[in-house]
Amino acid sequence: MARATLSAAPSNPRLLRVALLLLLLVAASRRAAGAPLATELRCQCLQTLQGIHLKNIQSVKVKSPGPHCAQTEVIATLKNGQKACLNPASPMVKKIIEKMLKNGKSN
């Protein structure tokens, strides 16, 4: 009975290259399929509020215009955990942002 020997290195380097290329393609396609594109390629604020009482706000995040959205977005995180989009042009929202910046509660 002849014994089969196992070699640590593959006997066909071309087969190894093809297998590695296939592995890379599969890994890249799975990453692309799992990427959250919908939230990255559009504005987060579809509707805005003119203002909200300052005592209900935990923090404020101001997102500058960019490739994902052409407008400035102001997103307030409320003390109850909800998020609310505020109108950045509203005088009340401008005052809220100033107070939050002064208190150090903005992102």
Curated annotation (Swiss-Prot):
In its UniProt record, which GO terms are filed under biological process? chemotaxis; immune response; inflammatory response; response to molecule of bacterial origin
What is the species of this protein? Answer: Homo sapiens (Human)
- Which keywords fit this entry according to its UniProt record? Chemotaxis, Cytokine, Disulfide bond, Inflammatory response, Pharmaceutical, Secreted, Signal
Name of the gene = CXCL2
Pfam families attached to this UniProt entry: IL8
Per its UniProt record, what InterPro entries does this chain match? Chemokine_b/g/d, Chemokine_CXC, Chemokine_CXC_CS, Chemokine_IL8-like_dom, CXC_Chemokine_domain, Interleukin_8-like_sf
Disulphide bridges: 43-69, 45-85
Described purpose of this protein according to its UniProt entry: Produced by activated monocytes and neutrophils and expressed at sites of inflammation. Hematoregulatory chemokine, which, in vitro, suppresses hematopoietic progenitor cell proliferation. GRO-beta(5-73) shows a highly enhanced hematopoietic activity.
> Example GO molecular function term?
chemokine activity
Key word Signal present: yes
Q: Where in the cell is it found?
A: Secreted
**Span of the signal peptide:** 1-34
Nuclease listed as a keyword:
no
What does the UniProt PTM comment say about this protein?
Answer: The N-terminal processed form GRO-beta(5-73) is produced by proteolytic cleavage after secretion from bone marrow stromal cells.
State the similarity comment.
Answer: Belongs to the intercrine alpha (chemokine CxC) family.
What name goes with this protein?
C-X-C motif chemokine 2
Q: Name one GO cellular component term.
A: extracellular region
Give the CDD domains listed for this entry: Chemokine_CXC
